[in-house]
Regions:
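Basic, Lys/Arg- and aromatic-enriched nucleic-acid-binding interface segment
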Residues: 46-54, 65-130, 136-138, 165-167
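C-terminal secondary-structure termini that scaffold catalytic or DNA-interacting sites
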Residues: 137-138, 152-167, 174-176, 196-197, ...
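Catalytic-site neighborhood detector that most strongly recognizes the C-terminal catalytic loop/helix
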Residues: 90, 148, 177, 285-310
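Short, basic (Lys/Arg/His-rich) helix/loop patches that form interaction surfaces
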Residues: 46, 101-106, 118, 170, ...
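DNA/chromatin major-groove-contacting recognition/catalytic segments
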Residues: 97-102, 153-158, 274, 295, ...
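Conserved tyrosine-mediated DNA breakage-rejoining catalytic core shared by Y-recombinases
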Residues: 78-79, 95, 128-183
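N-terminal DNA-binding recognition helix of tyrosine site-specific recombinases/integrases
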Residues: 12-16, 23-39, 43-77, 121-123
Length: 321
């Protein structure tokens, strides 16, 4: 939500701009000072580098427009830097099946079903109320009208969505409609995802919810044990199909990483694989910018050589000379 964006931008401003440059007057800052301030960001993600770069330029271009500076030190500072982000991969059909089988009787099941089969963002799922879930109509759908965020670990539900395009009505497939009907029949809350008192989840509650997934994965984990009064850091990588020592019922069944956002990415990817045109996918995903949808489209359409072979052969089939 917007509250989270504001909080992140304030943190970025304090950590990467105020800390290195805050003791200087605007007019004292040189291009070299700006470059030095950006050096630590070269080891961060390209997205963070770009954000801080933009914030710096906002400050100095605004000062220049207001005639507070004779010289703008940001002129000529490259907007490119940082490490490229990891490529997001959608879950395969086999991984989706295994994930759902693993969590079927566990608390995250409904959250995961909504993510996989409606593509809602985490903040939209956690803010979803039953008054926006329409199940007794010829075409069941979810109406996206609210967003969740937390302040001091307390949930705040607002009608301010991430973008204008995020406000939409999403038709849902039968498997999700059936799942939601079952949940609604026993729900004591106006929220689809709620705690035991019927309230929306706090940040720490959501993290605990997602831990049901993490602890069943084969992801390497760190723990500490005490030997002769000293704390020693140990690492362990669970074996697929193995069991947790303290809890034999817990099986390490997920041999892949999965994040909440990956559910949404999988939904979008599956629509594109099914041949849904990108403009419709843009609407269903609530993407304000078509570039976001087209980047995923390009990844889906062009990342498999075997799918492109016929196109390449057709392009170069005519004899030359």
């Amino acid at each position: 939500g917007l509250g989270d964006v504001y909080k992140r931008q304030t943190q970025n401003m304090n950590n990467y701009i105020v800390k290195p440059l805050g003791d200087m007057y605007l007019s004292e800052v040189t291009a070299d000072d700006i470059r030095l301030a950006l050096i630590p960001l070269s080891q961060k993600s390209a997205g963070l580098y770009s954000t801080v770069n933009m914030l710096l330029k906002c400050v100095f271009y605004s000062a220049e427009r207001n005639q507070l500076l004779d010289y703008n030190p940001c002129v000529g500072i490259s907007a490119k830097g940082g490490k490229p982000g990891k490529k997001k991969n959608a879950l395969t059909d086999e991984q989706v099946k295994l994930l759902l089988e693993t969590v079927r009787e566990l608390p995250p099941y409904v959250f995961i079903m909504i993510g996989l089969y409606s593509g809602l963002r985490r903040e939209e799922i956690l803010a979803l109320q039953w008054d926006c879930v329409f199940l007794d109509v010829p075409t069941p759908y979810i109406s996206v009208r609210r967003a969740w965020r937390t302040e001091h670990n307390r949930p705040v539900i607002s009608t301010t969505l991430k973008t204008k395009a995020a406000q939409m009505d999403i038709p849902i497939p039968k498997c999700l409609a059936d799942c939601l009907r079952q949940v609604k029949a026993t729900s004591i809350s106006e929220y689809v995802i709620a705690d035991s008192k019927g309230q929306p989840l706090a940040d720490s509650q959501f993290k605990r919810l997602w831990q049901y997934v993490v602890v069943r994965s084969t992801k390497e984990r760190t723990y500490y044990k005490y030997v002769n009064g000293q704390s020693i850091k140990c690492k362990v990588t669970p074996i697929p199909g193995g069991h947790q020592k303290n809890n034999p019922k817990l099986v390490y069944s997920l041999d892949f990483d999965v994040t909440p956002h990956q559910l949404r990415h999988t939904y979008i990817t599956n629509l594109l694989y099914a041949g849904v045109d990108p403009k419709t996918v843009q609407y269903l995903a609530g993407h304000e910018n078509s570039k976001t949808t087209m980047d995923i489209y390009a990844q889906v359409k062009y990342n498999k050589p075997e799918h492109l072979l016929s196109v390449v052969n057709a392009a170069f089939s005519a004899p030359v000379g």
